[in-house]
Design a protein with these regions (language model features):
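Long, non-coiled-coil amphipathic alpha-helical linker/lever segments
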Residues: 34-60
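PLD/PLD-like phosphodiesterase catalytic module centered on the HKD motif
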Residues: 1, 6-9, 13-15, 24, ...
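Charge-patterned, long linear interaction tracts outside catalytic cores
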Residues: 14, 20-21, 38
């Protein structure tokens, strides 16, 4: 069984303009999680099991991202500083924003690539000294969503379709 997780949509009209990433995998756990997710989409019934590999909104994505930010804070040390890298179209969610500020104040380095709206103000002494925000503007619309956590050397990478907006994290079904 093969599964594909992508960072955007499959709309043929925008495919020539958007740059996205995709993961083609034969990992049985990812495949099983995606079957459960599609069963939810087609039946409307809430899944009874927990996803083992994927993060899904509105079920667990936001809570898991907040937990990963908190974990980065707790694992960060002078010998092994924490690092969070996020690339999304927008960062509007107030809870994620607050968590990133907390991480910055705990000396976690945060690198954000945000194409559009961003609630974070980098470089504010005592609040966001450790946050760098850039926006990439070019010929192709940067459309990918990537979440990276150093996790004390046990690095984690996630890709998906959800931006860090309340509507994506709390209202829409997204992976």
């Amino acid at each position: 069984r093969y599964a594909h997780i992508g960072t955007g949509n499959y709309h043929s009209g925008t495919a020539r303009l958007y740059s996205d990433f995709g993961l083609l995998t034969c990992d049985p756990a990812v495949g099983s999680d995606l079957i459960e997710f599609f069963n939810f989409l087609t039946s409307g019934c809430q899944p009874k099991r927990r996803y083992s590999k994927i993060l899904v909104s509105p079920r667990n994505l936001k809570d898991q991202l907040l937990a990963k930010i908190d974990r980065e804070i707790s694992k960060s040390s002078s010998r092994s500083p924490g690092l969070i890298r996020l690339k999304t179209n927008a960062l509007e969610d107030p809870d994620i924003t607050e968590a990133l500020y907390r991480a910055s104040m705990a000396d976690v380095k945060i690198e954000l690539i945000i194409r559009d709206t961003c609630r974070i103000r980098p470089g504010i002494p005592g609040l966001s000294d450790n946050i760098r925000v850039i926006s990439v503007v070019g010929r192709f619309l940067e459309h990918s969503r990537i979440y990276y956590f150093r996790n004390g050397g046990n690095e984690e990478y996630f890709i998906g379709s959800a931006d860090l907006m309340m509507r994506n994290l709390e209202s829409r079904a997204e992976v």
